């Protein structure tokens, strides 16, 4: 019997991260029967920070850096990430070799009781500045309360009565078979999702040409183009996970429509921009939308946010 070559996949240990890694494993093994994948679970620095705010400790990159270190040390061949956890730009030594077909990118509201009985001054759980900003516009009287943990932990905190509602990504709930918990889907044109939300990225070393070729079979063109446009917005703005920035792209008949916003956490200022163009010019569209945001006062807003 010919021994199959083993591909080492590094990922976080949360149920959602393991689901995503298992999905990528199956995709690789189905497309390349001569390969066998092994999943390596990693507890990242972000996972270890159970009480501190991410904004005080380095941001979402803390969920990514340990996985990237495993790639650079050649302890793994590929790393599986939620794209929304990644920085706008890849370093020269690493690259996203495949963007897996995107799941539902929308944000959703999960309520402890019934949506119809949610009070105007409800305590809503989220740690995202982007969500806080848009929630204050959507429900001005609500009280925002920080929440940490994976999907299951956050749902348990809601069920225990610590919150009256929480905001999560539809994609994670659907992947974990928890779609029945969703009470309300936010319109992605009004309540704009996080950059890359719902998309999975498979990262590899830039010098590993064999792995790059292998990952091409997993790459979903439409997802790659949409995420490229969204990430270009943040690349030009220079935002981070502390900045209320959102961007969402869709493609129809090879035309890419990009919606973006930049605002203050309290929701009192929200700047919006939209652009439509050829999907092959995804990055240019993203840069143009970012320029529109800056021209509308985004430059001074960013300076204020970074003070």
UniProtKB/Swiss-Prot annotation:
Glycosyltransferase keyword on record: no
GO biological process, one term: protoporphyrinogen IX biosynthetic process
Reactions it catalyzes: 4 porphobilinogen + H2O = hydroxymethylbilane + 4 NH4(+)
Pfam families: Porphobil_deam (PF01379), Porphobil_deamC (PF03900)
Broad EC category: transferase
One Gene Ontology term of the molecular function aspect: hydroxymethylbilane synthase activity
Bound cofactor: record note: Binds 1 dipyrromethane group covalently.
DNA-binding as UniProt keyword: no
Cofactor list: dipyrromethane
Assigned EC number: 2.5.1.61
InterPro entries tied to this protein: HemC (IPR000860), Porphobilin_deaminase_cofac_BS (IPR022419), Porphobilin_deaminase_N (IPR022417), Porphobilinogen_deaminase_C (IPR022418), Porphobilinogen_deaminase_C_sf (IPR036803)
Entry's Gene Ontology cellular component terms: cytoplasm
Pathway assignment: Porphyrin-containing compound metabolism; protoporphyrin-IX biosynthesis; coproporphyrinogen-III from 5-aminolevulinate: step 2/4
Gene3D superfamilies: Periplasmic binding protein-like II (3.40.190.10), Porphobilinogen deaminase, C-terminal domain (3.30.160.40)
Keywords: Porphyrin biosynthesis, Transferase
Residue numbers carrying S-(dipyrrolylmethanemethyl)cysteine: 241
Family under the similarity heading: Belongs to the HMBS family.
Function: Tetrapolymerization of the monopyrrole PBG into the hydroxymethylbilane pre-uroporphyrinogen in several discrete steps.
Assembly behavior: Monomer.
Note: The porphobilinogen subunits are added to the dipyrromethane group.
Protein name (Swiss-Prot/TrEMBL): Porphobilinogen deaminase
């Amino acid at each position: 019997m010919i021994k199959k070559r083993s591909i080492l996949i590094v990922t976080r240990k949360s149920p959602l991260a393991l689901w995503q890694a298992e999905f990528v494993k199956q995709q690789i093994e189905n497309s390349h029967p001569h390969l066998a994948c092994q999943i390596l679970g990693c507890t990242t620095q972000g996972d270890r920070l159970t009480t501190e705010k991410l904004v005080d400790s380095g941001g979402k990159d803390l969920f990514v850096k340990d996985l990237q270190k495993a790639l650079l040390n050649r302890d793994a061949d590929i790393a599986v990430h939620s794209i929304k956890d990644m920085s706008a730009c890849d370093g020269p030594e690493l690259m996203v070799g495949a963007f897996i077909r995107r799941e539902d990118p929308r944000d959703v509201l999960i309520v402890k009781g019934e949506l119809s009985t949610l009070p105007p001054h409800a305590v809503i759980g989220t740690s995202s500045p982007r969500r806080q900003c848009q929630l204050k516009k959507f429900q001005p009287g609500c009280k925002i309360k920080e929440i940490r943990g994976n999907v299951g932990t956050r749902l348990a905190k809601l069920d225990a009565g610590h919150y009256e509602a929480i905001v999560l990504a539809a994609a994670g709930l659907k992947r974990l078979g928890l779609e029945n918990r969703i009470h309300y889907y936010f319109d992605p044109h009004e309540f704009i999702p996080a950059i890359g939300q719902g998309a999975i990225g498979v990262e590899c070393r830039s010098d590993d040409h064999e792995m790059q070729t292998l990952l091409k079979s997993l790459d979903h063109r439409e997802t790659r183009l949409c995420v490229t446009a969204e990430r270009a917005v943040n690349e030009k703005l220079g935002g981070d996970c502390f900045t209320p920035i959102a961007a969402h792209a869709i493609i129809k008949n090879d035309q890419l429509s990009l919606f973006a916003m930049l605002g203050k956490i309290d929701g009192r200022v929200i700047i919006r921009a939209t652009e439509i163009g050829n999907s092959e010019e995804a990055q240019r569209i993203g840069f143009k939308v970012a320029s529109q945001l800056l021209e509308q006062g985004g430059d001074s807003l960013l300076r204020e946010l970074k003070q």
